Amino acid sequence: DDVTFTSEGATSSALDHVSFTVPAGATVALVGPSGSGKSTCASLVPRFWDADSGSVRVGGIDVRELDPHALMEQVAFVFQTNRLFRASLADNVRSARPDATNDEVMAALHAAQCDDIVAKLPQGIHTMLGTGGAYLSGGEVQRVALARAILKDAPIVVLDEATAFADPENEALIQRGFTALAQGRTVLMIAHRLSTVVGADKIVVLDRGHVSEEGAHAELVAAGGLYARMWAEYEQAAAWKVANTQASAAASDTATQKGGEA
């Protein structure tokens, strides 16, 4: 509520009198150009930093009045760059809730669309990851991070660039895992790929530290503002990618046919 925040050493505010609400049980997406303040907003929820002025409230209570440990128990994170420990897959997921059983770990992995990961590992969930063990791709690591967040079962979830570095196949799996994670929870999501926020209950558009507009996807497209321009650019880029892929496939087919004729 009316939050202003300036990073240490910065000459201008990252957030300037920003206000928006995330209703309980809703998914709210933050979008905007690079440097608009999306990740800063997400970082203020768990008090990675504190606002210079204004307030960030969880359940109506200013986060600065909450016990830090209790606050962290209320929030699960899926970061832009997720890290796994040099430990088994099970222990990596179980770090969110150390008393979880193997069955609960498996259920979280299943919900996060990680069945293929478990199946390919030589010792399943007991396979060591990292140095001297198995390695996972960036998209696979993100799915394991989703499993960790699902197992934690916190009422609030913050996803920062959850699909930023995923390939198309992993992005689809991550989206299904996110759907499972979002069930019954309050979600604050930050993403550059606009396709991932279309189904959000509300989209808050940030621009240079200010709230430019907010509403549902269809409402914002119809409004013709910054979000509509971003969506048009996204659709244009997607159409170009499809056309380029089709052209490459056609050229490959032509080359194959000529090779066969020779």
Model regions: which residues?
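ABC-type nucleotide-binding domain
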Residues: 1-262
